[in-house]
Amino acid sequence: MTSSERTGFGPYLALTRLLCPLVPLALRWRLRKGKEMPGRWREKLGEASVSRPDGPLIWMHAVGLGEALALRALVAALEARRPELNILVTTGTRGSAEALAKNGIGGAIHQFLPMDCPKARAQFLDHWHPDFAVWSEQDIWPGLVHAAAERGIPQVWINARMNRAARDRRMRQARLYRAVYGCFQTISAQDDDTTRQIAAFGVTAQVDGSLKPAAQPLADNAQERDALTAAIGERRVWLAASSHPQDEAVALDALTHLAAPGLLVIAPRYPQRGDEIVADARARGLRVAQRSSGERPDAQTQVYVADTLGEMGLWYRLAEAALIGGTNDDIEGHNPWEAAALDCAILHGPRVANFATDYAVLDAGGAARQVMDGAALAAALDDPLLSCQTGRASVLVQRGRDLVDALASQLLTRMDA
């Protein structure tokens, strides 16, 4: 690390030293609120809950649920090439830990990322002493990057994503982020726009595309799927996936336009909204069953509110098509590739800024379709050509898996250098 890079980190490191005494208090408050896992919250203080295995170890970090699930294909590709390699995956959220426990992440170890303060950083790196570090997407902690660089640990940034607004925010601390990005041996970006934004910090990125198309299929319970299939009968099933209120309004409106409504499954992004969704659907005169109450759909059920966690793999397998949530309001979209991986046709509203490149690729390839309102959603669901979308999406998924295979080879070459 150059002297100018060390200088760039200075103010940030000083601030983390000052704030460090507050970290345990903040974590205990979050624990009381149910935002931390009772048996594992001290991992965020750098206290490992499992032993480090012998042998070389790659440390990979992704902040949340979607980002962590996107790493599963890369972990599988690395393990296929180097079975003896140990992989540590860190995340920051309780939801991501629960999703990885439900869906698996190969033979990798999961831990929570330590808070970015001196003692936690040191304890984490002392215990795990990784041979190589991989940062994914946007959650990059300057103090940890600095600490790893000081120990001579090679670091790369993959699946990098940065729009102009994010660049402008970071430019307010330009010296810090020039130092951070200068510590990476390689920066692998999702798209050309990201490379342009990163270039403003004096570093170069290569375009390899997004990891999300290669995401492994979400898990489900085959026995439960069979039971639900028997309960539903021959009716078609369609889904409002990871939905928010405006998505649900569009989906419920579509029921009045469909030639054969079938069964609408609403799987809200936040399951605690289940009672609210049930009340709204019943106010429209619809017959509703609620999963969190132990109810199953029957031949008369029009709406099934799937207000539970960790079952999206089940709903995507049951449904022939999904309206992806967050695409009808200022949420600006959720990940469409989970549906693609399970041959569920993708429909979405106009608000997709969080996954703009992904939806553009899917739409251009005839693998997804934009719908503006309930009538348009119903027309898409009634279109006999809707099923053609899944085959086109499968082609794009395979391209993503080829990308991941190439990236895994690049990372191992970097690690061995």
Locate the predicted segments by residue.
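Short hydrophobic helices that act as membrane-entry/anchoring signals
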Residues: 5-31, 178
